[in-house]
Amino acid sequence: MAFITEIANEAQWKTEVLETPGTLQVVEVFQSWCGPCKAVQSTFKKLYFDLNDRPLKFYSVSSERLSSLKEYVGKCKPIFLFFKDGKQVEKIEGVKAPQLNRIVTELSGKNPPPAAPAAAPAAPAAEAS
């Protein structure tokens, strides 16, 4: 089973990353001329298996494939983007395994239970005559 999904197009990016609530998506943005970073593969694999009870997915995508990632085209270092509920919540430039471990572990924690609904206001007391 592959633990990293490669994003092929904008539609997949939208469906897999931007429209998946409650899951931390870790996205490695790489350049087509050098491919995904092999140095970080073991870190991701360990996190994938150590945190398999958490809502967590790993992706890789070439910056040249998506117009929404054009700001990363030509970068020499891999970029790691962290998304939750369709919003980018963190970014790391370069291979920094301890920082990747910490951020993934912190951000992939299970979502807290929803807040209890507020109690209905008490009915006004009846006036005594």
Curated annotation (Swiss-Prot):
Residues 107-129 are annotated as: Disordered. It is found in: Cell projection, Cilium, Flagellum; Cytoplasm, Cytoskeleton, Flagellum axoneme. Keywords: Cell projection, Cilium, Cytoplasm, Cytoskeleton, Disulfide bond, Dynein, Electron transport, Flagellum, Microtubule, Motor protein, Redox-active center, Transport. It comes from the Eukaryota. Its main location: other. GO terms for cellular component: cytoplasm; dynein complex; microtubule; motile cilium. The keyword Transport applies. Transmembrane segments: none annotated. Disulfide bonds join 34-37. InterPro entries: Thioredoxin-like_sf, Thioredoxin_CS, Thioredoxin_domain, TXND_domain-containing. The keyword Nucleotide-binding does not apply. Pfam families: Thioredoxin. Residues 117-129 have a biased composition (Low complexity). Gene3D superfamilies: Glutaredoxin. Residues 2-109 form the Thioredoxin domain. SUPFAM superfamilies: Thioredoxin-like. PANTHER family: NME/NM23 FAMILY MEMBER 8, NME_NM23 FAMILY MEMBER 8. May be involved in regulating the redox state of functionally important thiol groups within dynein. Consists of at least 3 heavy chains (alpha, beta and gamma), 2 intermediate chains and 8 light chains. This is Dynein 14 kDa light chain, flagellar outer arm. It comes from Chlamydomonas reinhardtii (Chlamydomonas smithii).
